């Protein structure tokens, strides 16, 4: 049993070393640094806007979705506003993990995935802003 534990720890140590090497290799490409800085700034803006909406609401329920044709589609608790920035963070993490697997193949894929994450976070900021407008204007 001791050898099995030793092997598992050895594989975990090697996996951690490979992961660190892959992250450092990916961060060596300067556009990745710029993309990640912009992504984390946009996601921080997302979280701040969600906090502002949460703090501004004086009741327990908030309109979370509005359709022009049908009107209000979704009403929920105020804490559900934090789903929006969480989705942005999930997109950033998933795309970064995908980049760790394809980092050596193509620079185009790096720009595509991180650009998509930027676009998603911009749309999520617009979504939080629209939730604010629906509830307070």
Tell me what each language-model feature is:
Residues 125-137:
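Juxtamembrane boundary at the C-terminal end of a transmembrane helix
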Residues 26-41, 110-117:
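Alpha-helical transmembrane segments and their helix-start/interface "positive-inside/aromatic belt" motifs
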Residues 46, 89-104:
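Transmembrane alpha-helical segments in integral membrane proteins
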Residues 1-30:
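N-terminal juxtamembrane cytosolic/stromal segments of multi-pass membrane proteins
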Residues 53-81:
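Active-site and channel-lining beta-strand-loop segments
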Residues 78-90:
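Hydrophobic alpha-helical transmembrane segments
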Residues 99-122:
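Cytoplasmic juxtamembrane regions at transmembrane-helix boundaries
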């Amino acid at each position: 049993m001791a050898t099995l534990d030793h092997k598992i720890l050895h594989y975990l140590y090697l996996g951690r070393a490979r992961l660190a090497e892959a992250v450092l290799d990916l961060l060596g490409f300067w556009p990745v640094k710029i993309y990640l800085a912009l992504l984390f700034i946009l996601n921080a803006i997302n979280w701040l806007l969600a906090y502002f909406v949460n703090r501004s609401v004086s009741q327990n329920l908030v309109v979370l979705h509005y359709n022009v044709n049908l009107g209000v589609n979704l009403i929920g608790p105020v804490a559900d506003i934090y789903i929006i920035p969480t989705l942005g963070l999930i997109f950033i993490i998933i795309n970064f993990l995908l980049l760790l697997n394809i980092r050596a193949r193509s620079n185009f894929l790096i720009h595509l995935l991180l650009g998509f994450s930027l676009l998603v976070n911009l749309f999520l900021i617009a979504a939080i802003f629209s939730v604010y407008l629906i509830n307070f204007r």
